Amino acid sequence: MSQSASTPATPITAKIVAEHGLTEAEYAKVLAIMGREPNLVELGIFSVMWSEHCSYKSSKKWLKTLPTTAPWVIQGPGENAGVIDIGDGLTAIFKMESHNHPSYIEPYQGAATGVGGILRDVFTMGARPVANLNALRFGDPSDPRTRHLISGVVAGIGGYGNCVGVPTVGGEVNFHASFNGNNLVNAMTVGVARADRIFYSAAAGIGNSVVYVGSKTGRDGIHGATMASAEFSEDSEEKRPTVQVGDPFTEKLLIEACLELMNTDAIVAIQDMGAAGLTSSCFEMASKGGMGVDLALDRVPMREEGMTPYELMLSESQERMLMVLKPGKEDMARALFEKWELDFAIIGTLTDSGRMVLTWHGEVVGDLPIDPLAAASPEYDRPWEPTPMAAAADLSGAEDTPWSEALLRLIGCPDVASRRWIWEQYDHLVMGNTLQRPGGDAAVIRLDEAPGKGLAMTTDCTPRYVHADPVEGGKQAVAEAWRNLTAVGARPLAITDNMNFGNPEKPRIMGQFVGACQGISEACLALDFPVVSGNVSLYNETNGQAILPTPTIGGVGVLDNVEASVSIALKAAGEAILVAGGFHGSTGAWLGQSLFLREILGREEGAPPPVDLAAERKVGDFVRGLILGASVTACHDLSDGGLLVALAEMAMAGDLGAELTLEGHPDNGRLFGEDQGRYLLTVAEGDRDAVVAAAEAAGVPLRVVGTTGGDALVVNGFVGPSVAALRKVHEEWLPTYMAG
């Protein structure tokens, strides 16, 4: 070991340790592991590898409780992305990941590099990306920063995804004051690969070359992982240098070059450089394979002059990959990457030492054991307290607003208003396989690799539900994803989760995380809908104010006959409208935590609607059978805003009115209640009796509630808003707001 590593040039003071995000106890553990004081390079490596962002030290105890297996799961959590068997020798490979903290500081680049990073996670596994989705949460529209953040984030997502040539096909957007200081940007990519051509990240083969490919390394993103592991304060704007800068054109070249190399037998292991850059990719690959690595940092392609080993190890420059190649394949691989005008450098060798030895022009500048920084990194069992049960919602005044007025207000409120202004900035049709565009329950794409087969995908979470009851909210997020896939006729197969929460050092916040994990686990088990990948983003707080807990669920399902899928749009006049699924209570009206309660009565209170998972599955399986049997002409799950908002969305999508005929007085609870596990269906009048009989035989609640036709919504003879009036209100809020 050289003098530079054993006697640090920079004395490691308590201040420097704190600046690196390590606690006193963690630094004491570093000293015990190293048997000496680390130098600055080594301290920086411990800092990022033990950060919450990389180590999951507060969350992994609970993530281990999630169900991750099923006969169709090929690879669950622990790799770059999850892999599921979709039949015909094909797999779907997918993951969702957050880029929350960078997107608040520098919205365009933060969101753009979030897309770039999740694309790399998927094509690293050997898949060609076929679809992107995003789940976005912004602050109150009245907050002065919200408009700026929406503009930058949407432009960043579109700018990157459009240039790479992968369609952005769906997602969701919510607004709430709790996100004023921490917006959420959760990006999801789905790819398709042959089942016999999947690539993994475990390094193997003593003496094999460790190869760097892609863009050169600059100073952008240094300590990005550490920044994403701390609360924000008033000076967070000063963290702009820690936001990475993306180049989608280079990413496109990198995708094509990697996929071309994957058609040879050259690759032993491959890993993208994401959070913590070269450090994380090296340590993870070596740890998974039980290897050591000798790394010559002076061989790393550099974008800027005078870069130091510390900067090279911690940079989060984008569009970079690390590979282990088979002996003798280096020259062929170099020629391939040079053809694509990408950097290629052999920067290291695999060893059997179990250590990471870093050199700079032949001098050792770092020597660390691998496992304590990766597989054996810290794991905390943080104190947590359950969320108190919410008091019953005050429903006084619920009948004071006529349903027609309430509907117009809800259909134009920020959480329901059309997202057209957003998704029209995304190329959702590139590749030519998008069957259902944004705006429905789930996106549907055809697969070139298997004519007739399709994939459906969705993102879902209702943060206000999770805040009121994390267990029920976690269940509901999974159930709604399952329901949205079912509503287009897909067979739900698996999920990826993106767990966005506040400071886990606070027992109340940690309790939200634990509760959500419990709810997600219950729902996944009941619905045969395992977790195959995911991401955790904690410390989403500013000045001590936490976000609403947001465990976003990305769901993927398969359609063996993609032409059998249905959309939400009403198709023809004279068809029967039916509701599948029952109400929770005898009144048939769950208004606790509903949009109606918040937007019309101005109250956020009560418990969220409970989820009956057995009923959810029974009703969903029945509805899917109807769709695949060609009995259903349109289908929409009932969620935000309940029955009447769902019907209005179907009417606008099909440019056709509808009339509801309900038993008794149609009170606002029945019209806008958010009872779970329900679908709104239309069937041809000639099929109505057969469908009702089939439901009765299956023991599934199903009620005929109306008929399609006309140019307005009518309830029990009372003529409400026209479809044109609904569309005007629905479409105008977001463009008007963004015009400022």
Curated annotation (Swiss-Prot):
Binding site for Mg(2+) 1: E97, N535
UniProt xrefs under SUPFAM superfamilies: PurM C-terminal domain-like, PurM N-terminal domain-like
GO terms classed as biological process: 'de novo' IMP biosynthetic process
InterPro entries recorded: PRibForGlyAmidine_synth_PurL (IPR010074), PurL_linker (IPR041609), PurM-like_C_dom (IPR010918), PurM-like_C_sf (IPR036676), PurM-like_N (IPR016188), PurM-like_N_sf (IPR036921)
UniProt main location, coarse: cytoplasm
Domain of life of the native organism: Bacteria
Example of a GO MF term: magnesium ion binding
Positions of substrate binding: S98, H99, N100, H101, R120, Q244, E316, S317, Q318, S537
Reaction catalyzed: N(2)-formyl-N(1)-(5-phospho-beta-D-ribosyl)glycinamide + L-glutamine + ATP + H2O = 2-formamido-N(1)-(5-O-phospho-beta-D-ribosyl)acetamidine + L-glutamate + ADP + phosphate + H(+)
Broad enzyme group: ligase
Pathway info: Purine metabolism; IMP biosynthesis via de novo pathway; 5-amino-1-(5-phospho-D-ribosyl)imidazole from N(2)-formyl-N(1)-(5-phospho-D-ribosyl)glycinamide: step 1/2
NCBIfam families: FGAM_synth_II, PRK01213.1
Quaternary assembly: Monomer. Part of the FGAM synthase complex composed of 1 PurL, 1 PurQ and 2 PurS subunits.
Family per similarity comment: Belongs to the FGAMS family.
Function, in words: Part of the phosphoribosylformylglycinamidine synthase complex involved in the purines biosynthetic pathway. Catalyzes the ATP-dependent conversion of formylglycinamide ribonucleotide (FGAR) and glutamine to yield formylglycinamidine ribonucleotide (FGAM) and glutamate. The FGAM synthase complex is composed of three subunits. PurQ produces an ammonia molecule by converting glutamine to glutamate. PurL transfers the ammonia molecule to FGAR to form FGAM in an ATP-dependent manner.
UniProt-recorded name of the protein: Phosphoribosylformylglycinamidine synthase subunit PurL
Organism: Rhodospirillum rubrum (strain ATCC 11170 / ATH 1.1.1 / DSM 467 / LMG 4362 / NCIMB 8255 / S1)
